[in-house]
Swiss-Prot record:
A Pfam family per the record: RuvX
Function: Could be a nuclease involved in processing of the 5'-end of pre-16S rRNA.
InterPro entries from the UniProt entry: RNaseH-like_sf (IPR012337), YqgF (IPR005227), YqgF/RNaseH-like_dom (IPR006641), YqgF/RNaseH-like_dom_sf (IPR037027)
GO biological process annotation, one example: rRNA 5'-end processing
Organism of derivation: Rickettsia africae (strain ESF-5)
Keywords: Cytoplasm, Hydrolase, Nuclease, Ribosome biogenesis
Full protein name: Putative pre-16S rRNA nuclease
Localization, UniProt: Cytoplasm
UniProt similarity note: Belongs to the YqgF nuclease family.
EC category name: hydrolase
Length: 154
């Protein structure tokens, strides 16, 4: 189920279980995982498959493996706050994922996270090819970190 309110999302979480975050792109998905205490976000991996059924199966495997209690999906909103074509694509994906899992899903504004992730990797001297392979997972960890920081204030 997609939850629009962060406090409600937090209330539905199982204690001592991690969250995953997804940075959904047209060519790949970045995945990040929190620790059980919901205090640290770490890049996990990148899914380069574009077939939605295979993507959802991969996500279900990750959810089961790490015993995840909730999912955060980065929502790409225009800098002005307007909904874009990519926003609608991500919302549709979130709805499809919600049909496959019985976990709360929260959509988090993700403006500029992939660019920030790429810049961060660049500042560490990571080569372009490696940046392009990892920037979505790092962006997912930034999205997750934003939510974890907000949860601390609930």
């Amino acid at each position: 189920m997609i939850i629009k309110n962060l406090q409600e999302f937090y209330r539905l979480l199982i204690p001592n279980a991690p969250l995953i975050a997804i940075d959904y792109g047209s060519k790949k998905l970045g995945i990040a995982l929190s620790n059980q205490e919901l205090s640290i976000a770490m890049p996990l991996n990148t899914i380069t498959e574009i077939n939605k059924k295979i993507v959802i199966t991969s996500l279900l495997n990750i959810i089961e493996k790490y015993k995840v209690c909730g999912v955060i999906i980065g929502l790409p909103i225009d800098m002005s706050g307007a909904v874009t074509e990519q926003t609608n694509i991500v919302m549709k994906f979130a709805e499809e994922l919600a049909k496959s899992i019985n976990l709360p899903i929260y959509l988090q504004d993700e403006r500029l996270t992939t660019k920030a992730a790429n810049n961060l990797l660049k500042s560490f001297g990571v080569k372009r090819k490696d940046r392009n392979n990892n920037d979505d997972a790092v962006a997912a960890s930034m999205i997750l970190e934003t939510v974890l920081d907000s949860i601390k204030n609930i």
